[in-house]
Amino acid sequence: MSISNSIRAQIPPIHPEGYPFIGGFALVSLILFWIFTPLGWIGTLLTVWCALFFRDPIRVTPQREGLVVAPADGRISMITRALPPAELGLGDRPLLRVSIFMSVFNVHVNRSPVAGRIEKISYRPGAFINAELDKASEDNERNSLAISTPHGKIGVVQIAGLVARRIVSFVREGQTVGAGERFGLIRFGSRLDVYLPDGTEVLVSEGQTAIAGETILADFDVATPGLTFRSQ
């Protein structure tokens, strides 16, 4: 392998959603260099940061019936029981909820936590309060997905935050997704909630760091053997 290929292999790809932002920062940086060189270097640093924000690295997803993987990079901020958003149709009883908070330094491409069929997608506008607060799940802008699996339905909710002002979805209702498959993105810091059926065993703890598509959040069936992995 050549040196250039070796370097390229170490640099994660950029998601196309980031191209307009990176291009905009780069253009502003060029203008700032023309006006005042130190400002141009500041603009260059911001351009690099923007490129890092939209990075989309390959992930190796554990493949086995019943596994639930992390849908986002970040910190497990809360594990509790809570009512799922009414628009998902998951019932009116509290379900187990695992929340992942994403800072502006995390990868923000979101991945499906399970293999299944997307039964419903519902977008709801709202506020932009701190995504770490519990009430953010009710008050903030959100995009909710109900995914049907052989073990029951789960809910995945993308929640906007103080900085995040744009939720992007790559999927549609009726589409079949695999565990770890990309389904959306939230720009510049946010949170994801996963609602799990009763009886699911949670395998993470609050404060733990999660890696989208790789960290196993929970297991529907701990007795099932045969764990394999897939890069995607």
UniProtKB/Swiss-Prot annotation:
Cofactor annotation: pyruvate
Regions annotated as coiled coil: none
Lyase listed as a keyword: yes
Keywords: Cell membrane, Decarboxylase, Lipid biosynthesis, Lipid metabolism, Lyase, Membrane, Phospholipid biosynthesis, Phospholipid metabolism, Pyruvate, Zymogen
UniProt cofactor note: Binds 1 pyruvoyl group covalently per subunit.
Documented EC number(s): 4.1.1.65
Catalyzed reactions per annotation: a 1,2-diacyl-sn-glycero-3-phospho-L-serine + H(+) = a 1,2-diacyl-sn-glycero-3-phosphoethanolamine + CO2
GO MF term set: phosphatidylserine decarboxylase activity
Membrane topology: Peripheral membrane protein
Compartments (UniProt record): Cell membrane
Function: Catalyzes the formation of phosphatidylethanolamine (PtdEtn) from phosphatidylserine (PtdSer).
Protein name listed in UniProt: Phosphatidylserine decarboxylase proenzyme
Species the sequence originates in: Bradyrhizobium sp. (strain BTAi1 / ATCC BAA-1182)
The gene coding this protein: psd
